């Protein structure tokens, strides 16, 4: 009888530990979803300076944005922002996006694809986009 109780106690402890691990992973995924929603809202509404605050601080330091570069983003309007595919991981995630971009001066619209690279910073408990703002002028 005593062996049976010990076995149940060990199983109960194992399940509690497993649930605790799931809870932390769940919180991390929930934080990723919130960060991605905040990012996509900033891009959709043309708040590129706000979106810049969600870019990995190491990337921002290595690739600072000038006022002229931010002004260039004011020349476009985002018409749509669609999540095509995503592959979340424990500390990194990828998301393939389709973005509709309208040139405010010519009113010409075009569609582009952009891959978001996300990185989890355990020290700050935050997800950061690690590849900067979308380059609407790639190849121009």
Residue spans of the language-model regions?
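Short, aromatic-enriched amphipathic alpha-helices that serve as compact interaction elements
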Residues: 28-44
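Short solvent-exposed beta->alpha transition segments
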Residues: 33-34, 48-94, 107
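Exposed beta-sheet edge and beta->alpha loop/turn motif
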Residues: 88-140
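Bacterial N-terminal signal peptides that target proteins for export
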Residues: 1-11
């Amino acid at each position: 009888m005593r062996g049976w109780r010990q076995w149940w106690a060990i199983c109960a402890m194992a399940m509690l530990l497993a649930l605790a691990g799931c809870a932390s992973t769940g919180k991390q995924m929930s934080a990723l979803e919130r960060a991605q929603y905040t990012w996509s809202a900033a891009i959709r509404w043309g708040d590129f300076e706000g979106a810049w605050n969600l870019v990995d601080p190491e990337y921002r330091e290595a690739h600072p944005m000038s006022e002229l570069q931010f002004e260039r983003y004011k020349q476009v309007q985002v018409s749509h922002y669609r999540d095509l595919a995503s592959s979340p991981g424990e500390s990194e995630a990828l998301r393939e996006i389709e973005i509709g971009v309208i040139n405010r001066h010519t009113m010409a619209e075009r569609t582009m694809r952009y891959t978001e690279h996300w990185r989890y910073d355990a020290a700050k408990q935050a997800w950061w986009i690690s590849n900067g703002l979308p380059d609407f002028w790639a190849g121009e």
